[in-house]
A protein has these predicted regions:
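ATP-binding pocket architecture of kinase catalytic cores
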Residues: 39-180
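Short, Lys/Arg-enriched N-terminal segments with co-localized hydrophobic residues
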Residues: 1-7
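Juxta-kinase regulatory segment immediately upstream of eukaryotic protein kinase catalytic domains
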Residues: 8-40
Length: 180
């Protein structure tokens, strides 16, 4: 992870020792379940706050894998299946999300649940004021961000199959109670 000006880079590098997994088993799974054939290179992104994230390369194709971290976890934490389900549901809308490729809940494959999605090029801005771009580009970035937020707010969660997602009620109250 490095920052240059206001743009943050999560450039991939070697897989950290604590996050290594059976890459051959992953390649077999992806060939069988998603038709991704050929040699598979795995690198780990330097950033990420909760779930280890990896760049998968197979020929000219690139994908992102997100998996649960190792160790003891809160039962309701690190639910990569939820991430997958939400983005898969949003793919039915005009909200821009990467194409979901596969969800694997069989821990025998790489030791934990994971999902794979397409890799999309982009930039991550560390400073919300985005000082290193022109005024015009900054305005376009803010307009695009606001457009996507508006699209998210227009999503009818029932129409995209998320009516049974989560527990109704006060989410924040439950979180405060859990961590206090």
């Amino acid at each position: 992870l490095y920052a240059r000006g206001s743009v943050m880079s999560f450039a991939p590098g070697p897989v950290r020792a604590a996050h290594k997994f059976n890459e051959a088993a992953l390649a077999d799974y992806l060939q069988r379940e998603a038709g991704i054939a050929g040699s598979l290179q795995v690198q780990q992104f330097g950033g990420g706050q909760s779930n280890p994230t990896f760049l998968l390369s197979s020929g000219a194709q690139r994908f992102v894998l997100r998996k649960k971290p190792p160790g003891q976890l809160l039962k309701s934490a690190h639910q990569v299946d939820r991430e997958f389900r939400i983005m898969k549901a949003l793919s039915q809308t005009d909200v821009p999300v990467p194409r979901m490729v596969a969800l694997c809940e069989d821990e025998s494959v790489i030791g934990t649940s994971f999902y794979v999605m397409e890799y999309l090029e982009g930039r991550i801005f560390r400073d919300p004021q985005v000082p290193d771009v022109s005024r015009e580009e900054r305005a376009a970035i803010y307009d695009s961000m606001n457009d996507v937020l508006a699209r998210l707010h227009r999503v009818d969660y029932r129409k995209v199959g998320l009516e049974d997602f989560g527990r109704p009620g006060n989410y924040f109250e439950r979180q405060i109670t859990r961590f206090i």
